[in-house]
């Protein structure tokens, strides 16, 4: 495995890329091959793998591990023993950036988080994202967890070819149907954490925002 040197993160560390997808041209680039911590943009590849290998109608039982997050870490509020569909989990992942959803998805699709992460790395390489290495499906910081702006473009563009992904990230809210460990049905509603998707902010003039909740630079 390659060893990557990642500079200490600060406010000035950034990367910017502007891509012409149809013409397959890079219109603007600033440090697009610089290794950076991806934070919740990790969930782009989590969704890609889940959509490729999972069945959206499968019913998933949430494990204890999937609920084991600190109070200040973003979760959808799942409880151990909850049952909900893979479709519900993906919506919680993409709309509300649920780290609990990421782990539940990984365990269901591949049997374990570790096996799922192996698949994430394999699929990233298949897309040409050779400057990327994942160690978890949610993006919580780890020194060996990194990507580049160019690789993010490759992965996000691949996801945009999937109509189900586009539909999920375009919603203004989603209501999931769950059954608790004790067998009681209940619902949870999630709204986007992205200001553009929620309507709390407008895109610059002449720019159309294709919303992705977690396309940002700060730590999850």
Model-predicted segments: where are they?
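Active-site-adjacent loops and short helices of periplasmic peptidoglycan-processing enzymes
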Residues: 3, 7-150, 159-163
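Penicillin-recognizing serine hydrolase domain
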Residues: 9-11, 112-219
